[in-house]
Amino acid sequence: MKIVHVAPNAPYEEGWSYQENLLPKYQAKLGHQVILVVSTQRHHQSEQGCCSFEDYRSDDGYRVIRQPIRLFPLPFLRRTLQHLEVYDLLCREKPDVIFHHGLISPSVRQAVRYKKRINPDCVILQDNHMDYNIGFTVDCLKGRILKLIYRQLYRSTDRYINKVYGVTPWRKDYARDIFGVPEEKLDILIMGADDDQLDFANRDRYRTELRQKHGIRDDEFLIVTGGKIDQKKKIHLLMDAVKELEGVKLLICGTATEDFLEEYQSHLNPNVIDAGWIPSQQLYGYFFASDLAFFPGQHSVLWEQACASKLPCVFGKWEGMDHVNNGGNARFLDCSAPEQLRDMILQLRFTPEYQQMLAAARSDKTDIYLYSRIAEKSLECAVRK
């Protein structure tokens, strides 16, 4: 099949581990012709900018086309309804499947126009990455206006959309409640990890080398956490939880946001190793070196990547986020106070309960977090059709 991805709302870079990179990569590995259409927006060393039009083949086997973003003509909606002009491209490429990333860009109407005029058998898929934490809420006037605008946008295309995926159960519910997507059109397409980066055959080597690098004994219980660190991630509370624990170390892979840096540094202690920002290609080695992943706060894509690394995990409990527990690989915590975090660590530190979690994590149940499996699921309705 020929598949065109349209991703108007996020910067794209080669080598990143985001869905826009990995879903096309693994669909291409399945033998499909894949094109990714993104904006000319770039992101280098934490600085955003723009490039010129580009059309090239990525190292991962799919074609990338960069186009300038188009802003809506009314000033107060310029960014709200930004889009890419893709209709002519779709007519030229004649895709069998269009995967439109997000529910907030009018670009999807051009996909619908292509389906109506050129290829009635084309399958149109959308996904949603927004929720009540990182989306908009309806408790203010702006939020209510956005809800009306985006609901109308979806309503105008619903008849021609085959499936809408939430990347978590909560985000599936958000698509239903905020955008008005019918329940029967909704499904979950989780995020995960790049199979090619998971070097399970050398897991023991990573464990030995990285522990030696950071001065961690093999018999110490190593907890890993990280990401973009801010108040909502609650990693500072986990730092307090390990402060007085013997034989326990906390390895943090990530950097604190500028407004949280001073607070973060005040919680550093001898049981905490601050590894700084780790490139995504190297992050899996740190998961292999660890005994437990622990994320007490807001969701991060590292959650699913830790699950894919077959590492037992503890997560802060969020409604609609139970997809990261598949067969017993994870535990959830209602409370993030340091005392409760400490109790959970002691409950799991090389205990029989931990061994059960480890067995579940190492089983094939956690293969669902691999992008090779996610890519297959993303095309199920196209194959059935």
Which residues are covered by each model-predicted region?
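Acidic donor-binding loop of glycosyltransferase active sites
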Residues: 288-298, 311-312
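Conserved donor-binding/catalytic core segment of Leloir-type glycosyltransferases
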Residues: 4, 165, 217-233, 239-242
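N-terminal subdomain of nucleotide-sugar transferases
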Residues: 1-52, 56, 60-62, 240-243, ...
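A charged, aromatic-enriched C-terminal amphipathic alpha-helix characteristic of glycosyltransferases
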Residues: 352-382
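Nucleotide-activated donor-binding/catalytic signature segment of Leloir-type glycosyltransferases, i.e.
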Residues: 261-282
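Glycosyltransferase donor-sugar binding loop
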Residues: 193, 226-230, 249-262
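Carbohydrate-associated surface elements
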Residues: 170, 192
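Membrane-proximal helix-turn-helix segments that form the acceptor-binding/catalytic region
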Residues: 113, 117, 132, 144-164
